[in-house]
From Swiss-Prot:
Coiled coil: none
Statement: the UniProt record of this protein carries the keyword Lyase: yes
Domain of life, per lineage: Bacteria
Classification lineage: Bacteria, Pseudomonadati, Pseudomonadota, Gammaproteobacteria, Enterobacterales
Name of this chain's protein: Orotidine 5'-phosphate decarboxylase
Annotated active site: K73
Binding site for substrate: 22, 44, 71-80, 131, 192, 201, 221-222
GO MF term list: orotidine-5'-phosphate decarboxylase activity
Pfam families (alphabetical): OMPdecase
PROSITE patterns: OMPDECASE
GO CC field: cytosol
Biological process annotations from GO: 'de novo' pyrimidine nucleobase biosynthetic process; 'de novo' UMP biosynthetic process
Gene3D superfamilies: Aldolase class I (3.20.20.70)
Gene for this chain: pyrF
Amino acid sequence: MTSATKTNNSGSISSPIVVALDYANKDAALAFADRVNPRDCRLKVGKEMFTLYGPQLVRDLHQRGFEVFLDLKFHDIPNTTARAVAAAAELGVWMVNVHATGGMRMMTAAKEALLPFGQQAPLLIAVTVLTSMDGGDLRDIGINITPAEQAERLAKLTWDCGLDGVVCSAHEAVRLKQVCGEDFKLVTPGIRPEGSDAGDQRRIMTPEQAVAAGVDYMVIGRPITQSPDPEKTLKDILASLCKGAK
């Protein structure tokens, strides 16, 4: 294990917000990071930014005090996926994900690849059904059950493989907590504060609704990154969550 490893998998902040850092420009992404407090959120680096700027972007965010969710959705043969997950752990990310449809052998190999990292291993979660997909999209690829049924099936498989949780729609959260237990982490995209544009997400929910449903970490992008005052927007969302919890 290298000195790049930054935090243990429990993380060090209590905020449930993960901001999707979806920029095509590194300077713009870092400028955004400099405008928000790392105690208020974690940051998600996805395929576009990681392809453009690589591991150094993650290191730059770590240097600013942020915990990073590396959202690359690995889906390959077991050995290749395991090596990729181990590389993410070496980089020191807080969370990394794979596609549950890669199957039991792939997910088990990924989990075993993190054993040498002990308490410093990132959270390992699996993607169930993309929040942009509805029943028609599933039928197009030969899956003739509802998104909720498919998400539950894949969440059970993920739990059986010993992973930490799944990426899912907030609409499946209550059921998945019942099936997989309270310790099974639920990470949900498609979260939009009241009044925000839904964008390309079809199955959306507000932050307050997501927390009430049992979501552990909510991914929010443009409503925060495109805000004139992203730090205020973050604070407002956190305040609404605290108010809703009372």
